[in-house]
Structure formats: C-alpha cells, structure tokens
Amino acid sequence: MKMKDWSREKREKRENEILKLMGLEKFAESYPSQLSVSTEQRMVIGRAFAMNPDLLLMDEPYGQMDIKMRFYLEDEVIRLWKETGTTVIFITHNIEEAVYLAQKVLILTNKPAKVKERLSIDLPHPRNVSGSEFIRIRKYVTDQIKWW
C-alpha cells in the first residue's frame, strides 16, 4: 500500500477493513510465528485483496494444504471476491477446485498449451459439490482433459 502512495491513515483504514472482513482483528498485532498455518494463509489472502487490485492472479495457492483448509480458504476467496469485486484468475490442476470457484474455466491442451475450450459455469455460490449439475460439469471437464 506504500507503493500506491496511500497515506498512513488510508493504509490503516484499509488494513482494519480487511482484518474485520476476514474475522482476523484479534491478530492485527501478531507476528507470523505466532499464527497458525491456517490463520497465516488467511492473512496472505487478505493482504492480496487489501490492495484493491483490479486483477488478482492466484497460481495454485492451496497446493500444500489439507482438504479441510483448502475448502475453507476457497470459500474465503469467494467471499472476498464478492465483497471487493476484484477479478481473480485462479490457476489450478484440481478440476473440482476449478468448478467450485470459477465462473469461467479455460481447458488447456497438453504441451504446447493452447486453449481447447472456454466453459462458463453458471451455478450459484456456495456450490453444492454433491449436486447433480456440479458433478455433471466436473465430469465434462475431466473428459475434456483426458489424453490417455
């Protein structure tokens, strides 16, 4: 936020807004070593949205996380996206994650990667991962990337 030349007052206001939005107010004065892994990840995501970016690129941000934490953080990103209006480009190899998060999915070919298909996903959030339409879309995407 310093790089955007925001005043100290504006930076502090935005920091407090994001901390409140993420339910992290009580950790405002904590050091990273004092945070749990999940809280630290929430801070990282909040920090990215705090800049009010027009576009946020997230390249497999949940790669090392357990499934429970992954689901939780996916919902956090959806909530922040709705609250801020930031466009999020999410890169993943996880089909279920793509179908859960995205409004649009680009299916790529094998190397050299080219766009094979652009798929719009018109399901409301939060998405029901066991719902028939979700399962149908997930199966369709899986079928499109099979090369074996």
Give residue ranges: language-model regions.
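A short, proline-enriched helix->beta-strand linker immediately N-terminal to the Walker B motif
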Residues: 50-54
